[in-house]
Amino acid sequence: MALPRNLQDTFSLQEVQFLVENEPIKIMPRITTKPIRRKAASTPSAGSSVRWKLITTDDHNVNNMVAMSSTEVSLWLALLLKQQGKCSIVAPAWLTIKQLDSFIEFELQNTSRFANLPWNWLIIAHLLFQKAADDFRDPVHILRAKIQDLREARLGKIAKGLQHLNESHLQLDNLSLSEINEMRPFAVGVMDKLRDIHAAAADREQYANNI
C-alpha cells in the first residue's frame, strides 16, 4: 500500500517524535535499581539483590540507578519513569529563559545565519512542557512564549532563504529536523519545477543551434 502523497516526501510528526524519544536525557531517579551487595553473615541468602529490575534493550544505566544520583536514559524511558513518579527530568541547559533570550537575540541580529540549536529542540521542548512541566526552574508559560518567539524568528528567516532557492542547491545551516521537515515538500517541489524549466530551456537552445 502506497503512502499518502503528503507523507512521501516528509516524516510524519509521529516519526519525528519517535526519533527524538530515542535521544538521551539526564534524570534524577527516585528509585534505586543498582544491585546491593550483602555480607554473608547478615542474611541467610548471601549475594546480591535488586530492589527494582527494569527490562529494556539498553539496561546498564537503567538497572544501575541510585536514588537522587543523576544518570542518562532514553527520553521515552525518562517520560515513562516520570509518569510513574520514579524520577524527575533534568531540563536541557539550553531550555532556560536566559539561554532562549540569547538564541532569540542571535536570530534577530543575524539575518543570514541560524543559532546553533539542537536538531530536536522543538520536539524536546514540546514533550517536556507537556509531560514534565514541574521539573523546570523557570516558569513554563514564559518558556513556552520564548520558544514561540524563537520559532517565529527562524520561520521568517527560512522564508527569506527560500527566495534564493535554485534547481540544485539550498543552504540553510543549523535547522532542526522539524523545520526541515516542514519546508521540504515546498522546497523539493520548487526545485523540481526549476529543474524542468532549465531542462526545457536547454532543449530549446540545443534545437536552435541545430537549425
From Swiss-Prot:
Record flagged with keyword Nucleus: yes
Keywords linked to the UniProt accession: Chromosome partition, DNA replication, Nucleus
Compartments reported by the entry: Nucleus
One GO BP annotation of this record: double-strand break repair via break-induced replication
A Pfam family reported for this protein in Swiss-Prot or TrEMBL: PSF2_N
Record-linked InterPro entries: GINS_A, GINS_bundle-like_dom_sf, GINS_Psf2, PSF2_N
Gene Ontology, cellular component aspect: chromatin; CMG complex; GINS complex; nuclear replication fork
UniProt similarity note: Belongs to the GINS2/PSF2 family.
Identification of the protein by name: DNA replication complex GINS protein PSF2
Source organism per UniProt: Eremothecium gossypii (strain ATCC 10895 / CBS 109.51 / FGSC 9923 / NRRL Y-1056)
